[in-house]
């Protein structure tokens, strides 16, 4: 009986930890979305459209962000921290290198970007 009780206790605790981690992931995604959309923070939306939406205006110079869930987190981090490491002529500012976004803020933006699954190739008619 003691073994079953221990197993049930461990299972219950593991379940609580998993729910807690999902909640914190959800909070991180929300924080990243706020940074992405807020002009006094990351303001990514000034240059990047997401999920197949298009931007119309002077700041719509960045590529449309889509299917980012398949990108490695390290690659996304590098693009945000200092895009010039992979593209020396990038117009995107180095948000991390310049100190505009902290490490935690960049990770939050990445958590949000990883929720972007839209692919124009998957939706052609």
Where are these regions (language model features)?
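Bacterial N-terminal signal peptides that target proteins for export
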Residues: 1-11
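Bacterial N-terminal signal peptides
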Residues: 10-18
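Electrostatic cytochrome c docking/interface patches
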Residues: 19-39, 124-125
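The canonical Cys-X-X-Cys-His
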Residues: 32, 41-51, 109
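Gly/Gly-Pro-rich "capping" loops immediately C-terminal to redox-active cysteine motifs
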Residues: 37, 49-81, 91-97
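Sec-exported extracytoplasmic/periplasmic mature domains
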Residues: 37, 70, 81-85, 111-118
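C-terminal capping alpha-helices of c-type cytochrome domains
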Residues: 97-125
